[in-house]
Amino acid sequence: MLSSNQRKLISQLDKKKHRLEKNLFVAEGKKVVSELINSDWPFKNLFSTEENFHPDVELLTLADMKKITNFKTPSQALGVFFLPKSKKILSEPITIAIDGISDPGNLGTVIRLCDWFGISELICSKNTVDCFNSKVIQASMGSIARVSCHYVSDLGATLTEMQKPIYGATLDGDSIYSNKLPNKASYVFGSESHGISKTLLTKLEGKLSIPQFREGDNKVDSLNVANATAIFLSELFRGLKIKNG
């Protein structure tokens, strides 16, 4: 049975301030919660409408799940997990950096894309949405268990210290299809509405873009960052596969 204290805690964890204070976050959905459990992520509570979900599960009715869900339709499982300890940035050959994304769904999808392409860390500006926001966790579909998100106060300085060329995804850059994308570099993606910050633009070795093939005046203004990241990573790793045979 769900206690009032448990319900209050889960409600509080919807805000970043309380997540940091209590060192906890909430994950919803059977797949997402299972991914975290299978990665040995430490948890405080596990709730489910299914008795056989996990040996330590607290069985709840659908009515109780509705009281604690952040979504319109309650899921079969919800977990309260501990925030991870800070990790050192590894600076792998390919670094993906995010500048000022505020949409949780977009960030969660980017995390999932990084996981798909074998990228184990993501560097984020301090004004990017918190990766432990429950909607980010949901959109990542469990990939948050395998991709570390690092939040830095000065994204430009952090990327410069890695001593790799920095490229930015912009609307006015060179086509990714007419240039060989470097296999040791940092790639920066900004928000659809604001793009990459002016300060960070000065740090770029070059600008890259996805050409639009629709002709005429009635064109799409831009792609959202998740779509753009998917296309960039696909082209980048296609080039790496060709190079490596």
Where are these regions (language model features)?
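Short acidic-hydrophobic, aromatic-tinged amphipathic segments that line or gate anion-handling sites
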Residues: 1, 27, 58-61, 146-155, ...
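Boundary-proximal intrinsically disordered activation/regulatory segments immediately upstream
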Residues: 1-49, 128-130
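Amphipathic alpha-helical repeat scaffolds
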Residues: 29, 102-110, 220-228
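RNA substrate-binding interface of SAM-dependent RNA methyltransferases
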Residues: 38, 88-172
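Active-site regions of enzymes building and remodeling cell-envelope glycoconjugates
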Residues: 54-66, 93, 165, 180-186, ...
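Glycine/small-residue-rich loop that forms an oxyanion/phosphate-binding "nest" at active or ligand-binding sites
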Residues: 58-82
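Structured adenosyl-cofactor binding patch, chiefly the S-adenosyl-L-methionine
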Residues: 79, 115-117, 131-145, 202-245
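Active-site/ligand-binding-proximal alpha/beta "capping" segment
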Residues: 168-219
